[in-house]
UniProtKB/Swiss-Prot annotation:
One GO CC term on file: membrane
Organism classification: Bacteria, Pseudomonadati, Campylobacterota, Epsilonproteobacteria, Campylobacterales
GO molecular function: (3R)-hydroxyacyl-[acyl-carrier-protein] dehydratase activity
Recorded family membership: Belongs to the thioester dehydratase family. FabZ subfamily.
Enzyme Commission code: 4.2.1.59
Domain of life: Bacteria
Species, as recorded: Campylobacter jejuni subsp. jejuni serotype O:23/36 (strain 81-176)
Locations listed in the record: Cytoplasm
HAMAP family attached to this UniProt entry: FabZ
Catalytic activity line of the entry: a (3R)-hydroxyacyl-[ACP] = a (2E)-enoyl-[ACP] + H2O
Protein name in the entry: 3-hydroxyacyl-[acyl-carrier-protein] dehydratase FabZ
Length: 146
C-alpha cells in the first residue's frame, strides 16, 4: 500500500487538488487500485451543488489520472526522482458517467495499462462506489521533465 504521504512524494499535486488518498494495490506496468474518500467538507461542495451535493465528473477523471500517474512513475524502468518529472494528462476518450458520487462515498479507482511506449501511457480507467461503476474512460498521459 502507498499512503497519502508517499503519494505526495510521487505526484506534485497538493490539497485541495490531490484527489487520491491511498493506493491499495499496484502491479508494475499492469494495474493500480486506489481510492479517495469523498467528504462534505471538500471545497467543491460549496458550489456543486448547494443543497444537492454531487462530486463533479471532471474531478473523478482527474483522480483517475492521478492514480494512473502513480502507476506510471512506479513502473519506470530507470528509477528517477519524481520531483524532476511530471505526468501530463494528454487525452481522454469514451468518458461516461454512470451514477452520481456523493459525500460519504469512498470512490475507488482502477487503472489498467492498455499500452505503454517509453514515456507515453494509455490507461483504461474505471471508478466505483460500493462496487458499482460510476465512471469510466480511456486516459492518455506522458511523463516529461519539469
Amino acid at each position: 500500500m502507498i499512503d497519502v504521504m508517499q503519494i505526495q512524494e510521487i505526484l506534485p499535486h497538493r490539497y485541495p487538488f490531490l484527489l487520491v488518498d491511498k493506493i491499495t494495490e499496484l502491479k508494475v506496468k499492469e494495474v493500480v487500485l486506489g481510492y479517495k474518500n469523498i467528504s462534505i467538507s471538500d471545497h467543491v461542495f460549496m458550489g456543486h451543488f448547494p443543497g444537492h451535493p454531487i462530486y463533479p465528473g471532471v474531478l473523478i477523471l482527474e483522480g483517475m489520472a492521478q492514480t494512473g500517474g502513480v502507476l506510471a512513475f512506479e513502473s519506470m524502468e530507470d528509477k528517477v526522482d519524481p520531483k524532476s518529472k511530471v505526468v501530463y494528462f494528454t487525452g481522454i476518450d469514451g468518458a461516461k458517467f454512470r451514477n452520481p458520487v456523493r459525500p460519504g462515498d469512498r470512490l475507488d479507482y482502477e487503472m489498467s495499462v492498455v499500452k505503454n511506449r517509453g514515456n507515453m501511457w494509455i490507461f483504461k480507467g474505471q471508478a466505483f462506489v460500493d462496487g458499482n461503476l460510476v465512471a469510466e474512460a480511456e486516459l492518455k498521459a506522458m511523463i516529461v521533465d519539469k
